[in-house]
Amino acid sequence: MKVQYCDSLVIGGGLAGLRAAVATQQKGLSTIVLSLIPVKRSHSAAAQGGMQASLGNSKMSDGDNEDLHFMDTVKGSDWGCDQKVARMFVNTAPKAIRELAAWGVPWTRIHKGDRMAIINAQKTTITEEDFRHGLIHSRDFGGTKKWRTCYTADATGHTMLFAVANECLKLGVSIQDRKEAIALIHQDGKCYGAVVRDLVTGDIIAYVAKGTLIATGGYGRIYKNTTNAVVCEGTGTAIALETGIAQLGNMEAVQFHPTPLFPSGILLTEGCRGDGGILRDVDGHRFMPDYEPEKKELASRDVVSRRMIEHIRKGKGVQSPYGQHLWLDISILGRKHIETNLRDVQEICEYFAGIDPAEKWAPVLPMQHYSMGGIRTDYRGEAKLKGLFSAGEAACWDMHGFNRLGGNSVSEAVVAGMIVGEYFAEHCANTQVDLETKTLEKFVKGQEAYMKSLVESKGTEDVFKIKNRMKDVMDDNVGIFRDGPHLEKAVKELEELYKKSKNVGIKNKRLHANPELEEAYRVPMMLKVALCVAKGALDRTESRGAHNREDYPKRDDINWLNRTLASWPNPEQTLPTLEYEALDVNEMEIAPGYRGYGAKGNYIENPLSVKRQEEIDKIQSELEAAGKDRHAIQEALMPYELPAKYKARNERLGDK
């Protein structure tokens, strides 16, 4: 039995995992990062548009602060987020930006003087004063009051990932790629590491640790049409589910991005629209102002995606050999702007669509993009299975609720890596491994036997056909628009596919370097994740954020102001067990209300929301009359916790 020991085990080599590894290594803890691929190829590198942080540096971000970022995030979540976690996030994001700058991220900087921008499809001159020169710049993104998204042209995730990975290397973090965690080792409700398969040799290795953190990204690849990389299959989430103890939160909350390139599915950043790009239909008409006259193309992603599909349903889609699509027009920005700030977008359009976006419109169609759901954790990032932590897209830390704002993803990845990383390091420093050898042997031998049984199986089912059918079922029935009959059909067929996945036969009988074997053990896990999504969507009879039920079109704050918790306590069951965690209105800093999109009466109000809003107004007016500043008012409305090193107030231009 091969065993490796460490203080801190991080599963996943993207931004969240690597930043958490920095936190533990800085505390003198021996840290191992496991990754399916070389870490600098992680999906974090695909993030283009930027990272939200309320610096308030540029002219168009004047007056920005944590309060505005917090309000945008809560409204964007459709009041589904944990507001205390959202506060932790917005307070730490400016610190993260500056830390990354110190580590070498070449943030795009402000140039003093006049510059031309496209706002609402009109050329506008913005004048940046001399005192702003050289400060970190920001661009506009959907669902925000200020231009808050800091960026490095349109390669933000790439530069951030390289900087954090290099910091790990500098600190001596042990990074091991081509390693896949296939089960968590746990005893008496505590996690002590993972059983890992070497993807090259096929060896099964036990990694024993004082604490384990999962940061394996989202589960987009359960869908056919997705912007996610091929490694984003949700198996990191699934191994937590398979413990029978850890729970998954809000798995039905799946975001569809408005502007993936059609039909390839490669993302064209929200920065295209933030910089002034517009959406057009088959007639060349700019249609978003018809639906959302205030925010237009920069409404929240769930809203824009729905409006696009509605418009196609009205017969305004562009016909193509691959299906219908709409147009993204960034030609109005001019070639210089595109070649300076949207270079990756230009290359993607040229390589994968054969067009120059400075001259022609790009074909786009909403596709699956982000997973708001994940391993449910507390504010410290710890799951119900003690000693198991999670961060980034793999987690339901729950600062996104039922819809994520653009730019809050890579921001959360780094900020969660910082905050959760501190709590994770504290846990690892104060924990001893109390694991019996026979328990360790049981987990390792169990996985060795499972791999052997898969290659020796006489099963008749084709794992590739099962996987492809799962993707079709999810696309057809659990997409942007949902309803009871389609969701019932999805749950029924996914359950049948899950049963079939237990009877697969594979032709390649090797235990090493065998992609067919990998599919054989991954697909049942992916189907469990897909069932959590579909069953959660079926049972949630309301529309909230990215979860849109055409048969229940209103947000229901009386019955559904809660968080879905999915678990799989019995390995023999074929459907997840669902329960719900109430969101306490009386602890919210912003009471549930009108989100700002569509009809004002399109939600069922909870009477507690009215009462809470009255309390908020009373506290605020009394403290303002007493001369208290916004920080004191915020503390009175909703206290929250942060690691000591991140509690300091953020400084901005014009602060007194």
UniProtKB/Swiss-Prot annotation:
GO terms for molecular function: electron transfer activity; flavin adenine dinucleotide binding; succinate dehydrogenase (quinone) activity. It is an enzyme of class 1 (oxidoreductase). It catalyses: a quinone + succinate = fumarate + a quinol. GO terms for cellular component: plasma membrane. Binds 1 FAD covalently per subunit. The active site is at H257, R273. FAD binds at G13, G14, L15, A16, S42, H43, S44, G49, G50, T235, E393, S409, V410. Keywords: Cell inner membrane, Cell membrane, Electron transport, FAD, Flavoprotein, Membrane, Oxidoreductase, Respiratory chain, Transport. Its cofactor is FAD. The modification Tele-8alpha-FAD histidine is found at H43. Pfam families: FAD_binding_2, Succ_DH_flav_C. Its EC number is 1.3.5.1. Belongs to the FAD-dependent oxidoreductase 2 family. FRD/SDH subfamily. The fumarate reductase enzyme complex is required for fumarate respiration using formate or sulfide as electron donor. Part of an enzyme complex containing three subunits: a flavoprotein (frdA), an iron-sulfur protein (frdB), and diheme cytochrome b (frdC). This is Fumarate reductase flavoprotein subunit. It comes from Wolinella succinogenes (strain ATCC 29543 / DSM 1740 / CCUG 13145 / JCM 31913 / LMG 7466 / NCTC 11488 / FDC 602W) (Vibrio succinogenes). The gene is frdA.
